[in-house]
Amino acid sequence: MAKKVAICTLLYSRDYLPGALTLAYQLQKLLKHAVVEDEITLCLLIEKKLFGDEFKPQEIALIRSLFKEIIIIEPLKDQEKSIEKNKANLELLKRPELSHTLLKARLWELVQFDQVLFLDADTLPLNKEFFEILRLYPEQTRFQIAAVPDIGWPDMFNTGVLLLIPDLDMATSLQDFLIKTVSIDGADQGIFNQFFNPICNYSKEVLHKVSPLMEWIRLPFTYNVTMPNYGYQSSPAMNFFQQHIRLIHFIGTFKPWSRNTTDYDDHYYQLWRSTQRELYSECHLSNYFTHLQLGNIETETNFYHEPPCLQDLLNHGKRENQKHVDLDITSVDRNASQKSTAEKHDIEKPTSKPQSAFKFDWESTDYLDRVQRAFPKPDT
């Protein structure tokens, strides 16, 4: 019997928008050629404030075209207190933005689905065989979480790829546990291991809070190959298993869409960028997205490519006959009062103005029409 399966990612910061869009595009491509018996729904989980306040209508249109369902989520109960409590451990990672990954605890609330496959926005499935993951454990229970061992500490699992059974009681138990417990790493990976992974339950105080039925099912590493691995990676193993790798996970501060990633310019980073270029070219988004100001995560990272030469962009705009672009960049009217497409979706109009050197016609339907033609809404 076919299951209802959600393949989800979480967007907790606009810095990860390039990753989420590229991931959804790649999943759509692979699903067209995969033999999948289940009913698949691509879902984006996103905080209400982030979706309503920080995304422009063009971005919302593209998100809606790539994901069948956009699930607006509220902050967790006492989320700010939990973040503050976990601050010290999170500082050891030097990744303050990961505090919001605790929102993954909302995944167990998706009870409209029989199973949830969660993928971090900085992952890239490589082939249609990736979807075999859905057939590995047909008898999985709500007490079990399937994940790949973390390369930094293999007795713990990495939360970049998770297979789980939604359940409201489990969601409540996990979120209560999250409030009362300090995470090993200050983020989702630590707390999920403390909840599901018996190896992490050394403390009697922790043991009485979780069920003895909790279990971590170990997935093959090929379903979540992390990189860069800073000396941990086995080159012979990579060579031997290369044809069987199902998904690459770009961990750490620098992402394939980061400005300065020349040190990691290997095959898989190039593959991610090639997929991104394919996505943007299909609906002529180069002019817009190369000028997106995504802001910085609270590190030294700038999370987007250097914009191409302005003249190249102007020439490209002329070739594509993009009527929504105002080439007179010296006279951009930032105070133009124009109707936001977001109003059609009951989303509050963004207060920030586009930072691009180009001015977009917010009333024009040409942009939205091209997006819809390039990415028709998925049927499954």
Curated annotation (Swiss-Prot):
GO terms for cellular component: cytoplasm; vacuole. UDP binds at residues 10, 16, 95, 120-122, 249, 252, 255. Glycans are attached at residues 230, 232, 367. Gene3D superfamilies: Spore Coat Polysaccharide Biosynthesis Protein SpsA, Chain A (3.90.550.10). Residues 331-355 are annotated as: Disordered. It comes from the Eukaryota. GO terms for biological process: glycogen biosynthetic process. Its main location: cytoplasm. It is found in: Cytoplasm; Vacuole. It is an enzyme of class 2 (transferase). It catalyses: L-tyrosyl-[glycogenin] + UDP-alpha-D-glucose = alpha-D-glucosyl-L-tyrosyl-[glycogenin] + UDP + H(+); [1,4-alpha-D-glucosyl](n)-L-tyrosyl-[glycogenin] + UDP-alpha-D-glucose = [1,4-alpha-D-glucosyl](n+1)-L-tyrosyl-[glycogenin] + UDP + H(+). PANTHER family: GLYCOGENIN SUBFAMILY MEMBER. This is Glycogenin-2. It comes from Saccharomyces cerevisiae (strain ATCC 204508 / S288c). The lineage of its organism: Eukaryota, Fungi, Dikarya, Ascomycota, Saccharomycotina. The gene is GLG2.
